[in-house]
C-alpha cells in the first residue's frame, strides 16, 4: 500500500546513479568528506580514530570554527582512540543545546575477503562501497558537512549545536569515547536531546521505499556466566552426575524459556503503524498486539518472526561454551556465556532471577559479568522530536510513514540516557531487503540514499535547532 502511494517516479529515483556530473557543488564537497572518512582506517587493530578526528577538526577550523569551539580528547592508554567535540553556539539564552553523536570506529575488514578494497571509497553501479559507508561514516560525514556549511553560510541556530565524534562503539576492548564524555565531561556535551545512528529506512525488492524509522530507545546488553562444577574423576568409570551434562540441561532450559511479553509506547506505536501498512496475517497480528498485548493468538503469530519476537521481550541466548580439562577425565567444570538483551525498564537483577527460576537447578551458578548495566529507560516519544521528523520526511519521502522503532541491539545511546540526554536514531538513509552489509563483507549504501539522506538530515537539524 505504501509503495503504491510513492509511485513509479520515486521508485526510479531510488536506483538513480549519482555521477559527479549530476552533483551540486555542496554535494561534491560532502562526497570528499565521506571519502576521507571511509579511507581513514579506524579499525581497532590497525586504525586510528584520533587521526580521523583530527582530519574532521581541521575541516571545521578551516570553515571558521575557533580553537575554543573544538575539543579533542583521548586517554594515555588508548592514544589512537580519541575523539572530538565541536560546538556551534546558538542565539538563545533559554533554548537548551542539541547534540549530534557519531562513532568513528568501524568493524575489522580483511582485504582478502572483500571484492573491493574496504578502505577505498568506490562508487559502482549507483552504490558506494567501503567499510563504514553505512555504519556509520555516512552520518559522521553528514554532521561535519552540515556544520561546515552552517559556519560558512553564517547560519545562526537558536539552539547551540554540539557534535561528539567518538571511538569504541564497535568493541568492548577499546576506550569508549561516549562513555568517557558522559562520565567525565557531562557539561561539555550537555543537551536537551541527542541525534544518533539507529534509525533509517527500508526499500523493497523493486527499490520502492516502504518506511523510515526513528529509533526511540534500545535494549541493554548484559552478559552472564553460567557455570557448573563437579569433583570429576577418571573417564573409564563415568557417572550421570557430570558438569557438562548438567550445564547442557541448563542451556536447554534457557533455550526453551520465553521472557514475558512487554511493550512500551514506542513498540506499541511501531506495531500499530507498521502493521497498518501490511495486508498479510502478520500485519493483522501487529495491529492486534498494539491494541491488546494479552492477545495470545497475535503473540504466537509475531513470535514466528525472530525480529518481532525479540522486540516484544527480553531475550537471552548462549553464545560461548567451554568445559572439561582433559580428554580422559570427567569434567570438573563447564561454562557458557549467556548474552541477554534486556527490554528497556528491565534490570540485571530481575533478568538473573528469571533465568535462575527457568533453570531450576541451584547447582548451576549464574554470575553477571561486567560491565553491569543499570536499568535503561526508553527516550520519550516526544512530539517535539517526532513532529519535525515527519514534516521534513513529507518533503523528501512523500507518502512514506516515519515509524518509531526500538532497536534490539545497542549503540552509544546507552551511555547518554543514564545522564539525562534522551537519544534518537535518525531517519534518512535507507537500504534494500539485502541490507547494507554493515559489519560484514562489501558494506555499501546507494548513492541516492546517501545524498537524499544527507539533505534530509540537514533540514531536520535546522528544524530542531530553530525550535
Regions found by a protein language model. Name each.
Residues 4-15:
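Bacterial N-terminal signal peptides
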Residues 16-20:
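Sec/Tat signal peptide C-region and signal peptidase I cleavage site
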Residues 21, 59, 199-455, 462-467:
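Metal-dependent amide/peptide-bond hydrolase catalytic core
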Residues 21-131, 140, 150-159, 338:
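Acidic/His- and Gly-rich active-site-bordering loop/insert found
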Residues 23-31, 42-53, 79, 133-136, ...:
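Solvent-exposed, acidic/flexible segments
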Residues 43-45, 77-79, 91-93, 104-108, ...:
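Solvent-exposed loop/turn segments at secondary-structure junctions
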Residues 49, 96-97, 109-113, 173-178, ...:
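Short, solvent-exposed loop/turn and secondary-structure capping segments
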Residues 127-128, 134-213:
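Acidic/histidine-rich catalytic neighborhood of metal-dependent amide-processing enzymes
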Amino acid at each position: 500500500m505504501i509503495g503504491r502511494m510513492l509511485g513509479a517516479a520515486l521508485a526510479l529515483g531510488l536506483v538513480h546513479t549519482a555521477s559527479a556530473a549530476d552533483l551540486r557543488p555542496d554535494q561534491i564537497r560532502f562526497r570528499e568528506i565521506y571519502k576521507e572518512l571511509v579511507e581513514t582506517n579506524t579499525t581497532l587493530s590497525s586504525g586510528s580514530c584520533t587521526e580521523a578526528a583530527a582530519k574532521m577538526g581541521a575541516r571545521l577550523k578551516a570553515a571558521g570554527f575557533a580553537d575554543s569551539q573544538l575539543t579533542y580528547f583521548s586517554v594515555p592508554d588508548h592514544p589512537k582512540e580519541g575523539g572530538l567535540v565541536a560546538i556551534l553556539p546558538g542565539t538563545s539564552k533559554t533554548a537548551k543545546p542539541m547534540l549530534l553523536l557519531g562513532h568513528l570506529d568501524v568493524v575489522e575488514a580483511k582485504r582478502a575477503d572483500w571484492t573491493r578494497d574496504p578502505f577505498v571509497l568506490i562508487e559502482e553501479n549507483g552504490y558506494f562501497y567501503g567499510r563504514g559507508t553505512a555504519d556509520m561514516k555516512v552520518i559522521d560525514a553528514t554532521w561535519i558537512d552540515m556544520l561546515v556549511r552552517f559556519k560558512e553560510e553564517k547560519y545562526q541556530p537558536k539552539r547551540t549545536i554540539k557534535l561528539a565524534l567518538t571511538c569504541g562503539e564497535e568493541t568492548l576492548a577499546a576506550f569508549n569515547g561516549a562513555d568517557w564524555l558522559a562520565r567525565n565531561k557531562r557539561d561539555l556535551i550537555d543537551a536537551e536531546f541527542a541525534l544518533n545512528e539507529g534509525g533509517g529506512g527500508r526499500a523493497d525488492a523493486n527499490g520502492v521505499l516502504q518506511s523510515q524509522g526513528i529509533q526511540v530507545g534500545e535494549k541493554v546488553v548484559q552478559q552472564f556466566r553460567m557455570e557448573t562444577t563437579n569433583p570429576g574423576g577418571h573417564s573409564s568409570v563415568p557417572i550421570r552426575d557430570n558438569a557438562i551434562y548438567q550445564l547442557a540441561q541448563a542451556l536447554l532450559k534457557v533455550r526453551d524459556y520465553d521472557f514475558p511479553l512487554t511493550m512500551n509506547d514506542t513498540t506499541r506505536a511501531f506495531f500499530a503503524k507498521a502493521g497498518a501498512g501490511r495486508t498479510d496475517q502478520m500485519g493483522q497480528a501487529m495491529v492486534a498486539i498494539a491494541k491488546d498485548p494479552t492477545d495470545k493468538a497475535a503473540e504466537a503469530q509475531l513470535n514466528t518472526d525472530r525480529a518481532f519476537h525479540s522486540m516484544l521481550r527480553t531475550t537471552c541466548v548462549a553464545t560461548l561454551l567451554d568445559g572439561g580439562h582433559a580428554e580422559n577425565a570427567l569434567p570438573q567444570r563447564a561454562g557458557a556465556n549467556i548474552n541477554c538483551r534486556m527490554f528497556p525498564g528491565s534490570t540485571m537483577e530481575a533478568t538473573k532471577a528469571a533465568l535462575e527460576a527457568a533453570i531450576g537447578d541451584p547447582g548451576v551458578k549464574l554470575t553477571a559479568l561486567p560491565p553491569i548495566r543499570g536499568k535503561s529507560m526508553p527516550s520519550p516519544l516526544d512530539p517535539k522530536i517526532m513532529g519535525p521528523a515527519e514534516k521534513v520526511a513529507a518533503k523528501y519521502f512523500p507518502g512514506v510513514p516515519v515509524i518509531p522503532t526500538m532497536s534490539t541491539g545497542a549503540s552509544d545511546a546507552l551511555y547518554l540516557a543514564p545522564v539525562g540526554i534522551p537519544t534518537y536514531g535518525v531517519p534518512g538513509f535507507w537500504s534494500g531487503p539485502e541490507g547494507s552489509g554493515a559489519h560484514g563483507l562489501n558494506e555499501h549504501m546507494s548513492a541516492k540514499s546517501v545524498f537524499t539522506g544527507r539533505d534530509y538530515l540537514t533540514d531536520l537539524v535546522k528544524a530542531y535547532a530553530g525550535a
